[in-house]
C-alpha cells in the first residue's frame, strides 16, 4: 500500500510519500517517530483532555501532569471565541467547565479569562481557560498533541503551529473523504498529521474505510470505534495492521470499544481490558486512566 505520511505535507494525499526523520532529539520527535513505525510493538498512550481527574480538563495543569507521568499524546478540544481566539474547551458553552455561562462563540476571550475553570465535580479552581497557543507552548518538544474538534479550524490551527514550530507534533483526526482531505492539504506547503476515524459498524464508517482500502491508502493510523466486537470489527482491525497502519482505539467508555473500557480496567483486571485491546492489534490507546494504562503496558514491556 502507498504510505500516507501527512506529517510533512506529503502531497498529493493519494500518492506515495517519503518518510521524514524527526529533526531533533526531543521527546515529541521520538513519539512522532514511534507513530511512523508500524513495526514497533510499543503502545502509544493518549490522555483524553489531560489529567482531568486531578485538574480541570483541558487546563495547563492537566497537560503538565500527563507529561510528567509519561503520556505520549495530549488530546485537547478547541472552540473559537467571538473575537476569533482558539481556546481549549470541549463543549459549545462554558457552563460546565467554568464559573461563567454562555456559548464560546458569543463570548470574547477577555471575558472568558475572567472566569475560572471547574473540576469534574464542579468545584471552582484558580485555573483559567488556556488558548491553543498557550497549550502548544507548554507541549512543544515534550508531547504530541491530538487536536480534537479541530478540523473545522484547520487553517487557524496550522497558522499557530507554524508560528510556534510545532506542526510536526500535531495530530488531527476526522471523518472526511480522502478527496476532501487531499484538497485541504494541497492548500498548504506543510501540514499536520491526519488520521481517519472509522465507526466501522455504521454505514458512513464502513464506506470511509472501504474508500481507503479501494484506493490503496495506508494512513499513519486509523481510529477504529465499535460498540460490539464482531467478525466485521476483527476484519477491519486485521486489515489496518496488515496494511502497515497503526491501530488507535479508545478505552474511554463502553460504546467506543465494546465494553473494554477504563472503568472495567479500574474495577477489575487491566489485563482483561487493556490486554485484550493490545492483543487485538491496538498500538495507540486513548484513555481516561493514563497512569493505570501505562503501568499495565510497562508490566508487559510495551511502554518506555
Predicted regions and their residues:
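Bacterial Sec-dependent N-terminal signal peptides
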Residues: 1-27
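Phosphate-group recognition and catalysis centered on beta-loop-alpha active-site segments
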Residues: 17-304
Amino acid at each position: 500500500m502507498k504510505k500516507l505520511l501527512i506529517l510533512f505535507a506529503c502531497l498529493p494525499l493519494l500518492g506515495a510519500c517519503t518518510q521524514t526523520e524527526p529533526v531533533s532529539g526531543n521527546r515529541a520527535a521520538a513519539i512522532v517517530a514511534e507513530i511512523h513505525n508500524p513495526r514497533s510493538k510499543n503502545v502509544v498512550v493518549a490522555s483524553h483532555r489531560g489529567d482531568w481527574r486531578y485538574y480541570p480538563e483541558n487546563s495547563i495543569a492537566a497537560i503538565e501532569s500527563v507529561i510528567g507521568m509519561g503520556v505520549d499524546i495530549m488530546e485537547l478540544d478547541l472552540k473559537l471565541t467571538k473575537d476569533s481566539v482558539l481556546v481549549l474547551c470541549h463543549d459549545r458553552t462554558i457552563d460546565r467547565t467554568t464559573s461563567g455561562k454562555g456559548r464560546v462563540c458569543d463570548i470574547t476571550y477577555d471575558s472568558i479569562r475572567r472566569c475560572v475553570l471547574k473540576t469534574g465535580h464542579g468545584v471552582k479552581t484558580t485555573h483559567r481557560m488556556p488558548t491553543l497557543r498557550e497549550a502548544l507552548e507548554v507541549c512543544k518538544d515534550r508531547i504530541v498533541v491530538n487536536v480534537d474538534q479541530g478540523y473545522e479550524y484547520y487553517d487557524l490551527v496550522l497558522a499557530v503551529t507554524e508560528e510556534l514550530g510545532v506542526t510536526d507534533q500535531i495530530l488531527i483526526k476526522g471523518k472526511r473523504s480522502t478527496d476532501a482531505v487531499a484538497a485541504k492539504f494541497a492548500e498548504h506547503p506543510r501540514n499536520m498529521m491526519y488520521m481517519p476515524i472509522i465507526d466501522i459498524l455504521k454505514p458512513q464508517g464502513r464506506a470511509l474505510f472501504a474508500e481507503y482500502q479501494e484506493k490503496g491508502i495506508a494512513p499513519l493510523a486509523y481510529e477504529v470505534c465499535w460498540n460490539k466486537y464482531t467478525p466485521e470489527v476483527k476484519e477491519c482491525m486485521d486489515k489496518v495492521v496488515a496494511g502497515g497502519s497503526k491501530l488507535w482505539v479508545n478505552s474511554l467508555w463502553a460504546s467506543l470499544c465494546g465494553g473494554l473500557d477504563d472503568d472495567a480496567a479500574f474495577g477489575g483486571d487491566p489485563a482483561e481490558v487493556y490486554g485484550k485491546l493490545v492483543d487485538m492489534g491496538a498500538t495507540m490507546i486513548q484513555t481516561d486512566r493514563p497512569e493505570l494504562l501505562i503501568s499495565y503496558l510497562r508490566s508487559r514491556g510495551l511502554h518506555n
